[in-house]
């Protein structure tokens, strides 16, 4: 997970818990949901553009199986999605600082180097653009898959330890129907 996502998850969970109660969310398999009140929620951060400035509207959600299990238990799964414009580490200074902070090269990085795969661009900062809070039922997800605003993602991709990743789903945040949106705020969110 990138630092932006980690930071927003931690801050949001603390704020939600202190203002409206709730706890850390449950785990289903390897997937831990970030927050639980009446329903199960996950907090996401979504970069609105890639390192080349190309717009990105598809936000990666969770493990498909974990979402299904949460829906079976709670009936609704919610997502708190922060969209942001990233600052990319073009100079490599952020990566260098982070590598020094880690102290040693991770196994994932060693494997990447063996494959001669390029190191991905790091995000060194961001500006929050919007907050979108959505809730989805099983029926909403099925409808979204039929209509194309929810899709499968990451078949064949790998985790940091080299193991295969579980299938996730993505959502086109600009196509989510109004009946699934609880809050939509921006661009002057903060």
Segments predicted by a language model, with ranges:
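Nucleic-acid endonuclease domains
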Residues: 1-31, 36, 44-190
